[in-house]
């Protein structure tokens, strides 16, 4: 170990150990990067906040080798519906089969339980991933070589310092990290206060497994089955109502009774109050310090994407940081983090606002009809934005992005076979690096000498995807057993695509397979 390496206590410090922080720590440790986490609280926040995850998030968990463990503590979600109190259904979103190698497409969660499972997985990395509980970060001092992190023990008041190369601030909506880098959080906070009521289920009732949005101007309600035998209602307080009006279970029960929920159905477990925020940080980076999750963006809950957006931030930043720290990528790669993640966070924020207008009956019938209208003439099969597979809007890609382009899309994940007859999900056979996939062609044959040298420098693999009715020809060939990959490439007229470690398509032969600038 060199003198320079000995000067660091860890490669990366993560401030905050909620879902975003633990996802960042897991992503880094999985890539062999040392992490120290500073978490102010000693215990997991006991109230459920996020209520759902989808197949994109589960694919991230798969990349970390923990998806099967997470699946054991979450439950499938049936569908989404928007209804009025007289029983009129305004809109429904069914969940079609996932293209990302996960079944089903959406899951209900109970956040404290899932969060504990994530922390248990992180705990298996030993000294590579060290967590300091009860440690409040009070100062960050960065220079050209790293960051000095000062934390205060909440119990003893003792100050400690750690020297790291980079810092990820994942310390939530009230982020101190954000303040330490003089970052503003622009946007709005709505005046309306909501009560969140978490209950233990005592018996099943009809259609409990729908995620139901009760649409009403005065009392719109989110009604959702959580995992582990829990159920939640989110209800706005009326003008003049305050927290003091709901200080006991006896005062809370009338809110549930109005929807026909009785003590035979559930037992009230806990309740809390909050307001909806629509805010985003003006920058997500200052030198060696990055923001992720709620520290960078806050959105209303209507799209179920707040926590998931943070987890996706963590993966995007984590795989890039790991490769920069290992010397495999230039530090300029870190500029792509915000360029790629900010548009996606803005998309889900806007979608949440739009869906909220339906729930609160602020959307006109014409607007609702437009939301339910399927556009014509698309190359990509239409799916409602809430459930459609993700697409990059920019960043480290080459070529046009849009309906008719494969660039920026997440490659589907069917079951494939290798030359030895092994069958597995695509990602499990591709590994975690850059890969060029050819449609029944060796992608190397489509590259110039300089292009191949550039991909070689990134450690890329070259894989031909063969039809299941043909022979494999090379040691790295894969067979499209589910007949998904080859038709997907053909839809966009692509003979070969370059796939990033996060499974987004960076380039295609149509616009050129050169490494994106």
Model-inferred region functions:
Residues 72, 119-120, 166, 170-276:
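Conserved FAD-binding catalytic core of PHBH/FMO-like flavoproteins
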């Amino acid at each position: 170990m060199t003198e320079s390496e000995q000067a660091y206590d860890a490669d990366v410090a993560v401030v905050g150990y909620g879902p975003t922080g633990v996802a960042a720590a897991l992503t880094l440790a999985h890539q062999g990067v040392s992490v120290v986490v500073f978490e102010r609280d000693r215990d997991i926040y006991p109230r459920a906040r996020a209520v759902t995850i989808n197949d994109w998030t589960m694919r991230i968990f798969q990349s970390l080798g923990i998806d099967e463990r997470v699946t054991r503590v979450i439950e499938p979600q049936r569908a989404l519906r928007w209804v009025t109190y007289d029983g009129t259904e305004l809109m429904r979103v069914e969940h079609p089969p996932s293209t990302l190698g996960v079944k089903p497409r959406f899951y209900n969660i109970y956040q404290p339980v899932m969060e504990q499972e994530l922390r248990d997985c992180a705990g298996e990395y030993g000294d590579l991933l060290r967590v300091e509980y009860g440690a409040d970060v009070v100062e960050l001092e960065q220079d050209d070589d790293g960051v000095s992190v000062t934390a205060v023990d909440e119990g003893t008041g003792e100050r400690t310092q750690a020297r790291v190369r980079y810092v990820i601030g994942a310390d939530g909506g009230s982020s101190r990290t954000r303040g330490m880098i003089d970052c503003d959080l622009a946007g709005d906070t709505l005046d309306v206060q909501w009560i969140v009521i978490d209950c233990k289920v005592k018996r099943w009732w009809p259609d409990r497994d729908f995620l139901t949005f009760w649409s009403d101007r005065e009392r719109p309600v989110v009604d959702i089955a959580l995992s582990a035998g829990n159920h939640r209602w989110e209800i706005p307080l009326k003008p003049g109502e305050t927290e003091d009006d709901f200080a006991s279970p006896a005062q809370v029960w009338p809110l549930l009774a109005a929807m026909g929920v009785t003590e035979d159905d559930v037992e009230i477990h806990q309740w809390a109050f909050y307001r909806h925020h629509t805010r985003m940080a003006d920058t997500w980076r200052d030198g060696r310090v990055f923001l992720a999750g709620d520290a960078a963006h806050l959105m209303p809950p209507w799209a179920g994407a707040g926590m998931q957006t943070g987890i996706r931030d963590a993966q995007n930043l984590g795989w890039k940081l790991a490769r920069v720290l290992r010397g495999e990528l230039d530090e300029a790669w870190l500029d792509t983090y915000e360029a790629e993640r900010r548009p996606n966070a803005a998309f889900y924020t806007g979608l949440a606002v739009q869906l909220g207008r339906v729930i609160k009956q602020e959307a006109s019938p014409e607007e609702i009809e437009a939301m339910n209208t399927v556009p014509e003439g698309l190359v990509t099969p239409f799916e409602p934005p809430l459930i459609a597979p993700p697409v990059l809007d920019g960043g480290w890609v080459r070529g046009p992005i849009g309906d008719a382009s494969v660039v920026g899309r997440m490659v589907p994940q069917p079951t494939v076979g290798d030359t030895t007859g092994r069958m597995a999900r695509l990602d499990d056979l591709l590994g975690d690096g850059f890969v060029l996939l050819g449609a029944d062609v060796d992608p190397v044959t489509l590259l110039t000498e300089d292009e191949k040298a550039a991909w070689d420098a990134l450690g890329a693999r070259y894989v031909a995807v063969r039809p299941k009715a043909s022979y494999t020809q090379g040691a790295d060939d894969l067979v499209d057993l589910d007949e998904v990959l080859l038709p997907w490439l053909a839809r966009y007229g692509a003979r070969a695509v370059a796939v990033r470690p996060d499974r987004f398509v960076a380039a295609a032969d149509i616009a050129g397979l050169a490494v994106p600038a």
